[in-house]
UniProtKB/Swiss-Prot annotation:
Family to which the UniProt record says this protein belongs: To yeast SPO12.
Cited InterPro entries: Spo12
Gene that encodes it: spo12
Protein name as catalogued: Mitosis-specific protein spo12
Function noted in UniProt: Has a role in controlling mitotic cell cycle progression at the G2/M transition phase.
Length: 90
């Protein structure tokens, strides 16, 4: 009988079901995030100081604008160049 009890214990331990991992966590996560989303009107808030610029920022903007104005125009692709040459010939 001891062997049958040991066999039954071994079989019962093998037959134990393994619970699957929780797959619902993704849907729960989405539900939680949806509750915490900002309202759309809150994203369009403008501060009264948005139009103000510090002297340092103004200087940096002027410096950047100066270099952007001096830059070379972008190189046109070969197809655009050929089209412009053909239109000039006509």
């Amino acid at each position: 009988m001891s062997e049958t009890q040991a066999d039954s214990i071994a079989k019962s331990s093998v037959e134990t079901t393994i619970q699957p991992l929780h797959q619902e966590s993704a849907t729960l996560r989405q539900q939680v995030l949806q509750k915490h989303e900002l309202p759309k009107h809150a994203l369009n808030v403008a501060s009264p100081t948005d139009s103000l610029m510090s002297p340092c920022t103004a200087k940096l903007q002027a410096h950047k604008k100066k270099y952007y104005m001096k830059r070379k125009p972008p190189v046109m692709s070969l197809q655009n160049t050929l089209q412009s040459v053909q239109t000039e010939k006509e």
